């Protein structure tokens, strides 16, 4: 299998349009395992931060020496990884006062001042302070007692777990909280971070409330679209998966025998369509996650299902016959396959476009 990266011109357009709305961008590279080629594209596009969720990726970026931008940790950290957080990251998202106190002690040990963004939960029910009073107390403690931390801003996560969409109402709620914190600490915050790629459409259409000035964007820059937004100035289809056909023959479309569960403990759903031409390609769920996130590029191919190492295709309607040894191409229609594909040892990656050629 192989994949190709987008030209940096598209990400630059995205960043510049955010800048037009007075919004900085943290370029999120976790979905492509912080590949150096992608990190370079984001850095050259003018992002404020390079962001990822895993310390191992942070270390790889630092050791590769490819990034001059500040690094942002976007998963709230484990207590056990705080030494690495202080060593490797310039700024991190935080939502727990116990962790903040321990982080302050670690920063003191390392002789650093570490910047933090306090996360608020506005309904998506993942990370974040639920009560405004708790957030205000944490902000005051950071400002006046935790001398090796600097409160850089507040933020929110939406759409990742609870499917809650960004709206003017919840964005304005975040701005109001930021204003309350600013009154308490007596200074302006640097950043009010209004979410991730699903918030981009508000920045593009002018509905983002004033003072939201940082978005954490990965998916939309990598795929050129999200589930709720497909701007015409971004190119889609920038990742191509190639896989070789290892079997092709006519078979029944409904399993024959007593049925149980599949290799993943799931009850399968099968439609009896009679005898159909089927092809297997040499990639499976360990390579990309959900097979129904794949988009066959050849007309007439339908994804039927997958096991760990095989993908099953219906090729009955393909005009030109599919043969063993053919290499078929697929696009993706979701975020998940990128994370799998770029971390799989079984996937060979090729980068085209922009300044990358490999």
Protein language model regions, located:
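Active-site-proximal beta-alpha core segment in soluble small-molecule metabolic enzymes
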Residues: 23-169, 176, 184-185
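Conserved, mostly hydrophobic/aromatic
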Residues: 7, 30, 61, 118, ...
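Active-site anion/phosphate-binding pocket segments in diverse small-molecule metabolic enzymes
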Residues: 171-358
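Loop/helix-junction capping segments adjacent to catalytic residues or to phosphate/diphosphate-binding pockets
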Residues: 9, 36, 161-164, 289, ...
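Short, small-residue-biased leader/transition segments that mark boundaries at the very start
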Residues: 2-10
């Amino acid at each position: 299998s192989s994949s190709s990266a987008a030209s940096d011109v598209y990400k630059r357009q995205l960043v510049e349009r955010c800048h037009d709305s007075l919004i900085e961008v943290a370029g999120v590279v976790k979905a492509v395992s912080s590949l150096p080629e992608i990190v370079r594209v984001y850095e050259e596009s003018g992002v404020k931060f390079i962001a990822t969720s895993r310390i191992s990726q942070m270390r790889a970026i630092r050791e590769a020496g490819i990034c001059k931008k500040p690094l942002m940790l976007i998963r709230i950290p484990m207590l056990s990884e705080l030494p690495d957080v202080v060593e490797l990251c310039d700024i991190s998202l935080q939502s727990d006062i116990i962790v903040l106190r321990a982080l302050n002690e670690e920063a003191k040990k390392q002789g650093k001042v570490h910047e933090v963004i306090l996360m608020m939960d506005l309904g998506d029910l993942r990370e974040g302070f639920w009560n405004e009073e708790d957030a205000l107390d944490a902000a005051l403690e950071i400002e006046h007692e935790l001398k090796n931390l600097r409160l850089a801003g507040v933020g929110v996560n939406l759409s990742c777990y609870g499917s809650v969409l960004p709206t003017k109402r919840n964005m304005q709620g975040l701005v109001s909280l930021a204003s309350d914190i600013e009154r308490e600490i007596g200074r302006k915050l640097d950043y009010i971070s209004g979410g991730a790629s699903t918030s981009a459409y508000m920045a593009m259409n002018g509905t983002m409330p004033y003072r939201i000035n940082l978005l954490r964007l990965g998916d939309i820059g990598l795929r050129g679209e999200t589930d709720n937004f497909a701007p015409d100035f971004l190119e889609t289809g920038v990742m191509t998966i190639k896989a070789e056909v290892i079997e092709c023959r006519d078979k029944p479309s409904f399993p024959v025998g007593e049925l149980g569960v599949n290799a993943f403990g799931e009850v399968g759903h099968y439609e009896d369509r009679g005898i159909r031409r089927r092809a297997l390609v040499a990639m499976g769920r360990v390579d990309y996650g959900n097979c129904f996130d794949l988009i066959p590029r050849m007309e007439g191919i339908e994804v039927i299902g997958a096991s760990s190492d095989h993908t099953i295709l219906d090729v009955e309607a393909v005009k030109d016959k599919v043969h063993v040894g053919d290499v078929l191409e697929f696009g993706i229609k979701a975020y998940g396959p990128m994370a799998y594909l770029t971390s799989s040892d079984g996937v060979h990656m090729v980068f085209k476009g922009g300044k990358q050629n490999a």
